[in-house]
UniProtKB/Swiss-Prot annotation:
Domain (SAP): residue spans on this chain: 371-405
Post-translational modification summary for this protein: Ubiquitinated; by STUB1/CHIP at the C-terminus, leading to its degradation by the proteasome. Phosphorylation by GSK3B is required for STUB1/CHIP-mediated ubiquitination. Phosphorylation negatively regulates the intrinsic myocardin transcriptional activity. Phosphorylated; by GSK3B.
Domain remark text: The C-terminal region contains a general transcription activation domain. The N-terminal region, comprising a basic and a Gln-rich domain, confers transcriptional potency and specificity by mediating association with the MADS box of SRF. The basic domain may be required for nuclear localization. The SAP domain is important for transactivation and ternary complex formation.
Name the record gives this protein: Myocardin
Species the sequence originates in: Homo sapiens
Length: 938
């Protein structure tokens, strides 16, 4: 291969040589080349030069023609002061001079409009003044007067202040003296300096070398200005010239600040530490929003940890420990290092701002003993919490944290002394707030976070951050129990969280905010008054409708005796509260009612916005009843905060997770029975109060009622009415319903589609009593209600009696006062009530003991108090009077237990249920009317 390559290259070289020889032989002489015009001749004749001249002249003519084609119109040239407007013959140089002056005059007018004022010229060291005057002017101690300004022009005498145009045109070259003067732009400042030089007839050209203009511009300014230019004061120019000569270049003093050395990004040196002692003041609303978000995240973590902890332990031992330990801690530690907020004699508004002036007011957690173990990111996070700069090396960061490490050994507050921090809005709730916050200080080891927002809502998300109300609905499957059991793992985080709530800011910081808060309170009070008035108007309309309904009931139902029923309503609240600023006041309930807890996992008796206490007493055998609780409305639907009482909030059930309510066996109830051999099973649901006009009455969130069912003995079975009778009763009742719906639609209380909803409610399929299907499920799935016994699930007939209770459903679901979605009424009827006088034989003490039978179900004593008056018992059954309500009389739905139907024969006890149900709405203030409807109906 190499031999072939070398031979090939030799061949190419030989060919190249032969071609070169041929070309050298055939080349032409210089004369031939000159004759052919390829190269110029050695001696050029004169003809050649003439040809070159002609070529050049032709080129010039061509370029001129091209320029003439592209030139502007004469009108444009006149506007640009290049051509004269008049056609009079004048000499060319004078015309050009006038045009140049006109151009300069236009420039001067623009520069004069943008020039700086005399005060700026003094501050920029452009105008020479005495040092004392200059110091006073720079310190803003003396207002700049005309007498100190030797260089003030006549235009400046009208305004010594700075206009916005003047502040834009500061000199950037001299702006290092003061930081606010450093916002200058280059072009207006040089133009303005040129203006001053022209007007002062060049006297300042000696002083301002850095801002000198081209010579022709200053000369043209000295030659005289055209008509558009402003007149100049001659004496000012003369004074300035003489003074400038005498001063002979006024030297600028050196800038007090040293020049900042430019550093690369890794050589950053933090600013002086002294300036960082007090963090910059934050906007209070933004600081509150940040604090709410931080609290929300911390609570989310705590609730998730609590859920894991709850599933780890068995129910019973944890429950007893939860009952005993916090109460013992309350006895042992009544006073501790953390002073509760509720004892400080501040107004509620001041309480809402403690610890909220900035994020730095949070008390940070303790530092580890060895700072070297921390990473740089963790060190920076600790510095950020303490409001310190976070830049520098790791050693510098550790040096900044060391003084805080020494101070971090303070005693942390005990678990039993963490105080509920509530932030009421209205000033009328102050006595309730002060009295209840001391009692709610973790009496049972539960703490409850109130709403930290006392200002108008910032956004729909942040305004509803009443933390305890929003957490459980946001995390539906997480346990939102804030009643954290005192375990050594989580107590530290809880204490740091609550100490950050309690501590932080001195009351002196709050005094400056009083005037602003008073205005906010007045505005909120006006809003509350308006909303109260609207609610009263709506309540009057509902009362009128109720009166009409009562008249119809008296006319239609006088001849026939209606059958008793047992109604259970499961309701889902979707209405937005009409009083968004109303704060909730804790309501005391006696600790007589004990909470129910399931054995397998902690089921929810307490929805996030309410709680229900279940007192069960059974005799001789267990009754296992299952219930579905429909989840209550989420916090974006109800801006009201959670009930401010320490309560146990456990896992909110969904229809996929049925939870069972146990009732323990034993002869506990036998001592309370006087004549009847039947014990009772009482389930009381927490009531929610009306928002009364004086705004002192308690306001609650939506409760979630917990239902338990039991049946009576099989021996007392009576036959249901025949199918034809039930159909007739339903027909007459549905006609009455249609008439009432017409009235409501005409008055505007209901939308026009209420009639279709009513017809849908009546078309629920009937379940025959003889059938043995495993479940009896109603049509609305979100309010599904299943009934179970230990072995099997038993059907029941929800339509044994007439359907008049749908009127109440429609009133609550379609009225604008409170829309109630997915309400299902379950009724069990029989011909005659057999247990009408079941509570009549009880003395007051026995009835109270029956309600106080909390030994049956172990549970913590709830601070929520329900006062039962045993005297309010009539012949039809038990009525409870809610004594702390603002209503005149709270008429409870009294339900007498019916005879057992064949569908309930599989349930093993012979105990009826005296069943008190309330389904109410925060905005639906016609609670009296809803209860009266049931009382009139049955």
């Amino acid at each position: 291969m190499t031999l072939l390559g070398s031979e090939h290259s030799l061949l190419i070289r030989s060919k190249f040589r032969s071609v070169l020889q041929l070309r050298l032989q055939q080349r032409r002489t210089q004369e031939q080349l000159a004759n052919q015009g390829i190269i110029p001749p050695l001696k050029r004749p004169a003809e050649f030069h003439e040809q070159r001249k002609h070529l050049d002249s032709d080129k010039a003519k061509n370029s001129l023609k091209r320029k003439a084609r592209n030139r502007c119109n004469s009108a444009d040239l006149v506007n640009m002061h290049i051509l004269q407007a008049s056609t009079a013959e004048r000499s060319i140089p004078t015309a050009q001079m006038k045009l140049k002056r006109a151009r300069l005059a236009d420039d001067l007018n623009e520069k004069i409009a943008l020039r700086p004022g005399p005060l700026e010229l003094v501050e920029k060291n452009i105008l020479p003044v005495d040092s004392a005057v200059k110091e006073a002017i720079k310190g803003n101690q003396v207002s700049f007067s005309k007498s100190t300004d030797a260089f003030a022009f006549e235009e400046d005498s009208s305004s010594d202040g700075l206009s916005p145009d003047q502040t834009r045109s500061e000199d950037p070259q001299n702006s290092a003296g003061s930081p606010p003067d450093a916002k200058a732009s280059d072009t207006p400042s040089t133009g303005s300096l040129g203006t001053n030089q022209d007007l002062a007839s060049g006297s300042e050209n000696d002083r301002n070398d850095s801002a000198s203009q081209p010579s022709h511009q200053s000369d043209a300014g000295k030659q005289g200005l055209g008509p558009p230019s402003t007149p100049i004061a001659v004496h000012a120019a003369v004074k300035s010239k003489s003074l400038g000569d005498s001063k002979n270049r006024h030297k600028k003093p050196k800038d007090p600040k040293p020049k900042v050395k430019k550093l690369k990004y890794h050589q950053y040196i933090p600013p002086d530490q002294k300036a960082e002692k007090s963090p910059p003041p934050m906007d209070s609303a933004y600081a509150r929003l940040l604090q709410q978000q931080q609290l929300f995240l911390q609570l989310q973590i705590l609730s998730q940890q609590q859920q894991q902890q709850q599933h780890r332990f068995s129910y019973l031992g944890m429950h007893q420990a939860q009952l005993k330990e916090p109460n013992e801690q309350m006895v042992r530690n009544p006073n501790s290092s953390s002073t509760p907020l509720s004892n400080t004699p501040l107004s509620p508004v001041k309480n809402s701002f403690s610890g909220q002036t900035g994020v730095s007011s949070f008390k940070p957690g303790p530092l580890p003993p060895n700072l070297d173990d921390l990473k740089v990111s963790e060190l920076r996070q600790q510095l950020r919490i303490r409001g310190l700069p976070v830049s520098g090396t790791k050693t510098a960061l550790m040096d900044r944290l060391r003084p805080f490490q020494d101070c971090s050994g303070n005693p942390v507050p005990n678990f039993g002394d963490i105080t509920t921090v509530t932030f009421p809005v209205t000033p009328n709730t102050l006595p309730n707030y002060q009295s209840s916050s001391s009692t709610s200080a973790l009496s049972n080891g539960f703490y409850h976070f109130g709403s930290t927002s006392s200002s108008p809502p910032i956004s729909p998300a942040s305004s509803d951050l009443s933390v305890a109300g929003s957490l459980p609905d946001t995390f539906n499957d997480a346990s939102p129990s804030f009643g954290l059991h005192p375990s050594p793992v989580h107590v530290c985080t809880e204490e740091s969280l609550m100490s950050s709530l309690n501590g932080g800011s001195v009351p002196s910081e709050l005094d400056g905010l009083d005037s602003e808060k008073d205005k906010m309170l007045v505005e909120k009070q006006k809003v509350i008054n308006e909303l109260t008035w609207k609610l009263q108007q709506e309540q009057r309309q509902v009362e009128e409708l109720r009166m009409q309904l009562q008249k119809q009931k008296r006319n239609n139902c006088s001849e026939k005796k209606p059958l008793p029923f047992l109604a259970a309503s499961i309701k889902q609240e979707e209405a937005v509260s009409s009083c968004p600023f109303a704060s909730q006041v804790p309501v005391k309930r006696q600790s007589s009612s004990s909470e129910c807890h399931p054995p397998a996992c902690e089921a929810a008796q307490l929805q996030p916005l309410g709680n229900a206490h279940c007192v069960e007493s059974s005799d001789q055998t267990n009754v296992l009843s299952s219930t579905f609780l429909s989840p209550q409305c989420s916090p974006q639907h109800s801006p009201l905060g959670a009930v401010k009482s320490p309560q146990h909030i456990s896992l909110p059930p969904s229809p996929n997770n049925p939870h069972f309510l146990p009732s323990s066996s034993g002869a506990q109830g036998e001592g309370h029975r006087v004549s009847s051999p039947i014990s009772s099973q009482v389930c009381t649901a927490q009531m929610a109060g009306l928002h009364s006009s004086d705004k002192v009455g308690p306001k609650f969130s939506i409760p979630s009622p917990t239902f338990s069912k039991s049946s009576s003995a099989i021996s007392e079975v009576t036959q249901p009415p025949s199918y034809e009778d039930a159909v007739k009763q339903q027909m007459t009742r549905s006609q009455q319903m249609d008439e009432l719906l017409d009235v409501l639609i005409e008055s505007g209380e209901m939308p026009a589609d209420a009639r279709e909803d009513h017809s849908c409610l009546q078309k629920v399929p009937k379940i025959p009593r003889s059938s043995r299907s495993p479940t009896a499920v109603l049509t609305k799935p979100s309010a599904s209600f299943e009934q179970a016994s230990s072995g099997s699930q038993i059907p029941f007939d929800p339509y044994a009696t007439d359907s008049d209770e749908h009127l109440e459903v429609l009133l609550n679901s379609q009225s604008p006062l409170g829309k109630m979605s997915d309400v299902t009424l379950l009724k069990i009827g029989s011909e005659e009530p057999h247990f009408d006088g079941i509570m009549d034989g009880f003395s007051g003490k026995a009835a109270e003991d029956l309600f106080n039978a909390h030994e049956i179900l172990p549970g913590p004593l709830s601070p929520m108090q329900t006062q039962f008056s045993p005297s309010s018992v009539d012949s039809n059954g038990l009525q409870l009077s809610f004594t702390e309500s603002p209503w005149e009389t709270m008429e409870w739905l009294d339900l007498t237990p019916p005879n057992s139907t064949p569908g309930f024969s599989a349930l093993t006890t012979s105990s009826p249920s005296i069943f008190n149900i309330d389904f109410l709405d925060v905005t639906d203030l016609n609670l009296n009317s809803s209860m009266d409807l049931h009382l009139q109906q049955w």
